[in-house]
Amino acid sequence: MKRTFQPSRLVRKRRHGFRLRMSTKNGQKILARRRAKGRKRLSA
């Protein structure tokens, strides 16, 4: 059976990256929440 996690840096950046988050209203809400919480890393 194939494992579910097949790492790819490009796919990771494109799907969960900062620029994707900034590009949508809800993505910006996610970043705002993570900033408020004090996360060291805001996105992938």
Curated annotation (Swiss-Prot):
Ranges of biased composition (kind: Basic residues): 31-44
Disulfide-linked positions: none
GO BP: translation
Single GO MF annotation: structural constituent of ribosome
Similarity field: Belongs to the bacterial ribosomal protein bL34 family.
PANTHER family: LARGE RIBOSOMAL SUBUNIT PROTEIN BL34M, MITOCHONDRIAL RIBOSOMAL PROTEIN 34 FAMILY MEMBER
Protein name per its UniProtKB record: Large ribosomal subunit protein bL34
